[in-house]
Structure formats: structure tokens, C-alpha cells
């Protein structure tokens, strides 16, 4: 029986990732102290196949920081030799990626249909958006705000008790395709909001007085690609004139210091900003919706992974928002609330200094539109599993994040503008 379960798990992992096997691949964490170290990493990236996990690209590495990256099996010896020869301190976060890829799925035989404690394929999430709206007509309605590059409908769930001219909070998940815990949280949020409405005073008040616009997966094409072809795909799946490389980083594609810093103009790079701001159908759909609802949207929350961080503007420049002190105090209180459940520690602060400079992000864009409360959440973990957070951690991750979102929402409700 045990052998059968192992075979089922291996078969699932293989089926989910289009034949990628990951055997012998490693994930390194390197301590970077100065520009010389950065140059060594840059040279490595130019001669070997390196997939940067944190930060997103070699251009975002800063002195006195760490960098996490994935290395193909055939390059691991070369990479370790270079790091040792140049006396860079490092550790191996994942010694055999295949084992961790397979372990992200619960070893139990997977039930068909939707589950809030498993990672769901897009077709399952799509069906869920219809089902959850149909089953809860007094609290949820579903709409389509646009289509993806490959022609798929982008669904938005409006969660809240019916009412006229209610203030709203916009929350999206699934910007970067490989960050699977992000869409899992948006689904959990909707379920918990409905389940606890009428039972929990705080949630009931929030849904009575606020609307939540929840976008479960923005980058649907990319998300599907991570299930069928390439588990660590990040970008959209758009094509580009004059290049065979695919995709744009949707979180470098907004008109907020577009492509000025921490983004690339090379279509082959993971942080490609696109040929123009809002060039991607997905980002344009999101931006158009927010512009149309700008008078009612009081907070913007975007859910990513990994790092355990809560960041706020600005990321496209080393400057602070006009209500920076308020954002800092709110972030401090929110991460304290989050930690109260499972002890998970988050760091917080302005994006550029807390994580890295990055232009064209949706949080900065929303803030510059006049949405005073704009936050990015980087969910679990801090690198042990990275983008491969096991399904066994979905519940705890979502429980603590739900606390955080409730805290922010209650604050916003008390500080309407």
C-alpha cells in the first residue's frame, strides 16, 4: 500500500509539471556582502542556467543581502566551485528539488473537485468561482473584468452584503504564476468570509459595511503553464514582436515609474516590464476596473510569496508615501496580529528598502491613484520551501493571513476618506 501511495505521489508530480523531473537540481542561498560578490553572481548567471527566486533577477541583488536561486543539476558542481573559490558564504536550501516538488502535494490520494487545503488547477478554481457565487447569492456575485492573452475570462468576486455606494477593498492573487499559495489564500478568504458571516461580529460588520473585490487569479495563462509545462514559470504568456521569448512580468507592467528601476527591457528576462505600461491584457483589465471604481476603493491588497513580508509604497523609488507613518504603524500592528496565531514572523516597511527596488508594481500604482492603504503581502515561507510550500501548510498560512486582512479591513473601515 505504501509503495502504491508513493507511486501515486510521483505520478501526480510528474503529471503536474509536463515531464520536468528536477532530479539533482538545487536551490542555493548566498550571502552577498559587496559589489564584487554581485559581479560574481552576475557572471555565474551569464554562464549557467540560474533561476532567481529571491530577488527576482540578478539586477536586484543588493550588498549585505542574501540571494536564493535554483540551479540545474548539470551546473551545481560548477556553481559550488565558483562560490567556494571566491569565498562566498552559502548554504543549500534544497539539496534535491525533485523531492520537494513531490512533497508539496499531500501524499494522500487526491480527491477530485475543489479543496481549500490543496492547490487547485485553474479549471477547478474557475468552476469554484461560479459555484461559490451561486451558493451564496446574498453575499457573492461573479463578474468578468477582461480576458487573458490566451483568451480566458478573468473572474472577479464581489463579496459583501448588498448595499448602495459601499466603500470597498480590492484584493488580488496569482500575479506571478509559480506563487501557488497566493491563489489558495484568495479562495480561503472567500470561504471564510462567507462561513463566518453572521457568526463572527468582526466579519459580519466588515461584509455589512464594505465590499471586497477579490480576484482569485490574475495571471491565469501563467498559472496553467505551471501545472502543465513549467512549475517555476513566473510571467504572463504573451508573445513579443522580434523575440522568441514569452511573457511579461505583470508586476513590472503598471504605470508607476514604469521600467525605471528593478525591471528589464529584455523580453527574455523574468522581470521584463513589457513593451509599454499596461501592455498586458491582464494588467490593463485590473487597472481599468480600479480606475472605474476608484471613488469607492479605499484599500488595495496584493498577495504574493515568498518572504513573510508586508510592504507598502514605494518600490519604484527610494521615497516615502505622504502617509508613511500611518502605513508603517498599520503594518506593524498587522504583522503582530498575524503572528498571534502561529507565531509566524513578518518583516515590514517600504518596498525599495525592505525587499528591493522595483518599478511598475501594482501596489505603487494603486497608491499613486489615490488609494491610501496599499500593501503587498509576501506569504510563507522564508526559503525552506520557497515557491513549493507544502499543502500541509495551506491552512495555517491562510488562517494567519485572514487575521491580517481582517485587521487591515477594520482599520480602513474606521479611517474612511
UniProtKB/Swiss-Prot annotation:
Binds 1 zinc ion per subunit. The keyword Oxidoreductase does not apply. It is an enzyme of class 3 (hydrolase). Keywords: Carboxypeptidase, Cytoplasmic vesicle, Disulfide bond, Hydrolase, Metal-binding, Metalloprotease, Protease, Secreted, Signal, Zinc, Zymogen. One of its GO terms (cellular component) is extracellular space. Residues 118-412 form the Peptidase M14 domain. Its cofactor is Zn(2+). The active site is at residue 378. It catalyses: Preferential release of a C-terminal lysine or arginine amino acid. SMART domains: Zn_pept. Pancreas. Disulfide bonds join 173-186, 245-268, 259-273. Belongs to the peptidase M14 family. This is Carboxypeptidase B. It comes from Homo sapiens. The gene is CPB1.
Amino acid at each position: 500500500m505504501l509503495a502504491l501511495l508513493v507511486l501515486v505521489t510521483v505520478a501526480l508530480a510528474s503529471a503536474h509539471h509536463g515531464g520536468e523531473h528536477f532530479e539533482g537540481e538545487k536551490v542555493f542561498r548566498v550571502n552577498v556582502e559587496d559589489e564584487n560578490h554581485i559581479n560574481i553572481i552576475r557572471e555565474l548567471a551569464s554562464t549557467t542556467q540560474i533561476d532567481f527566486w529571491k530577488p527576482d533577477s540578478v539586477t536586484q541583488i543588493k550588498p549585505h543581502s542574501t540571494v536564493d536561486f535554483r540551479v540545474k543539476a548539470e551546473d551545481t558542481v560548477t556553481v559550488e566551485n565558483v562560490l567556494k573559490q571566491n569565498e562566498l558564504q552559502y548554504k543549500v536550501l534544497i539539496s534535491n528539488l525533485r523531492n520537494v516538488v513531490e512533497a508539496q502535494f499531500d501524499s494522500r490520494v487526491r480527491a477530485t473537485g475543489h479543496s481549500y487545503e490543496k492547490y487547485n488547477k485553474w479549471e477547478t478554481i474557475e468552476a469554484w468561482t461560479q459555484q461559490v457565487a451561486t451558493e451564496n447569492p446574498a453575499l457573492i456575485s461573479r463578474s468578468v473584468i477582461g480576458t487573458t492573452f490566451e483568451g480566458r475570462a478573468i473572474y472577479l468576486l464581489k463579496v459583501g452584503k448588498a448595499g448602495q455606494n459601499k466603500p470597498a477593498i480590492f484584493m488580488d492573487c496569482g500575479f506571478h504564476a509559480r506563487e501557488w499559495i497566493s491563489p489558495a489564500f484568495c479562495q480561503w478568504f472567500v470561504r471564510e468570509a462567507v462561513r463566518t458571516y453572521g457568526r463572527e461580529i468582526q466579519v459580519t460588520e466588515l461584509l455589512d459595511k464594505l465590499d471586497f473585490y477579490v480576484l482569485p487569479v490574475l495571471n491565469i495563462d501563467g498559472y496553467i503553464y505551471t501545472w502543465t509545462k513549467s512549475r517555476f514559470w513566473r510571467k504572463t504568456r504573451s508573445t513579443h514582436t522580434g523575440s522568441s521569448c514569452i511573457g511579461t512580468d505583470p508586476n513590472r507592467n503598471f504605470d508607476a515609474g514604469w521600467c525605471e528601476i528593478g525591471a528589464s527591457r529584455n523580453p527574455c528576462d523574468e522581470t521584463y516590464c513589457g513593451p509599454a505600461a499596461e501592455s498586458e491584457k491582464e494588467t490593463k483589465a485590473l487597472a481599468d476596473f480600479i480606475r472605474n471604481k476608484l471613488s469607492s476603493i479605499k484599500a488595495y491588497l496584493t498577495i504574493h510569496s515568498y518572504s513573510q513580508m508586508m510592504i507598502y509604497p514605494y518600490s519604484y523609488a527610494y521615497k516615502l508615501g505622504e502617509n508613511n507613518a500611518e502605513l508603517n504603524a498599520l503594518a506593524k500592528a498587522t504583522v503582530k496580529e498575524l503572528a498571534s496565531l502561529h507565531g509566524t514572523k513578518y518583516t515590514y516597511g517600504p518596498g525599495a528598502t525592505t525587499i528591493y527596488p522595483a518599478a511598475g508594481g501594482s501596489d505603487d500604482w494603486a497608491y499613486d491613484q489615490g488609494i491610501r492603504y496599499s500593501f503587498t503581502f509576501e506569504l510563507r515561507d522564508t526559503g525552506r520551501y520557497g515557491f513549493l510550500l507544502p499543502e500541509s501548510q495551506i491552512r495555517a498560512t491562510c488562517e494567519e493571513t485572514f487575521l491580517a486582512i481582517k485587521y487591515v479591513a477594520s482599520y480602513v473601515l474606521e479611517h474612511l476618506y
